[in-house]
């Protein structure tokens, strides 16, 4: 599930972060998912076993909220409308809720794989 990322490289260099932040904000607004009330993690495809496991670990409230946001966005898409501006997802509300769980599951899988391939040396 993990793809190559430049996040750490950009975060280490303050000048690069300041330079790319306006471009990042413009791109997020141009994507339009916030105008439909979605969060960035709502866009992660559910066709992966890791993501399905992460979705099962969500709290019932967060799971319900996610389904509600996706259904509302689907209805808006079908009617070719956007939410009123006061209902758009703000930058403060758009926090990752699924990505930390995915990272945790991937780390657990890597640890399990490392332990499964562990070679025991007997002296």
Swiss-Prot record:
Provide the Gene Ontology terms for cellular component: matrix side of mitochondrial inner membrane; respiratory chain complex III
Question: What Gene3D superfamilies does this protein map onto?
Answer: Cytochrome b-c1 complex subunit 7
* Membrane topology reported for the UniProt record: Peripheral membrane protein
Q: Name one Pfam family in it.
A: UCR_14kD
- What would be an example GO MF term here? ubiquinol-cytochrome-c reductase activity
Compartments, as annotated in UniProt:
Mitochondrion inner membrane
Just give the chief location class.
mitochondrion
GO annotation, biological process = mitochondrial electron transport, ubiquinol to cytochrome c; mitochondrial respiratory chain complex III assembly
Q: Which keywords does this Swiss-Prot/TrEMBL entry list?
A: Electron transport, Membrane, Mitochondrion, Mitochondrion inner membrane, Respiratory chain, Transport
InterPro entries, sorted: QCR7, QCR7_sf
- Name the family: Belongs to the UQCRB/QCR7 family.
Relate the assembly described in the record: Component of the ubiquinol-cytochrome c oxidoreductase (cytochrome b-c1 complex, complex III, CIII), a multisubunit enzyme composed of 10 subunits. The complex is composed of 3 respiratory subunits cytochrome b (cob), cytochrome c1 (cyt-1) and Rieske protein (fes-1), 2 core protein subunits pep and ucr-1, and 5 low-molecular weight protein subunits qcr6, qcr7, qcr8, qcr9 and probably NCU16844/qcr10.
Q: What is the protein name given in its UniProt record?
A: Cytochrome b-c1 complex subunit 7
Species for this entry: Neurospora crassa (strain ATCC 24698 / 74-OR23-1A / CBS 708.71 / DSM 1257 / FGSC 987)
This chain is encoded by the gene named: qcr7
């Amino acid at each position: 599930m993990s793809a190559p990322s430049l996040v750490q490289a950009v975060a280490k260099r303050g000048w690069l972060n300041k330079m790319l932040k306006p471009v990042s904000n413009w791109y997020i607004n141009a994507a339009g998912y916030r105008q439909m009330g979605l969060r960035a993690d709502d866009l992660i495809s559910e066709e992966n076993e890791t993501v399905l496991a992460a979705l099962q670990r969500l709290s019932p409230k967060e799971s319900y909220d996610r389904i509600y946001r996706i259904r509302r966005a689907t209805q808006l898409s079908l009617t070719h409308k956007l939410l009123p501006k006061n209902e758009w997802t703000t930058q403060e509300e758009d926090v990752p809720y699924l990505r930390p769980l995915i990272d945790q599951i991937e780390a657990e899988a890597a640890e399990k794989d490392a332990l499964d391939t562990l070679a025991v040396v007997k002296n």
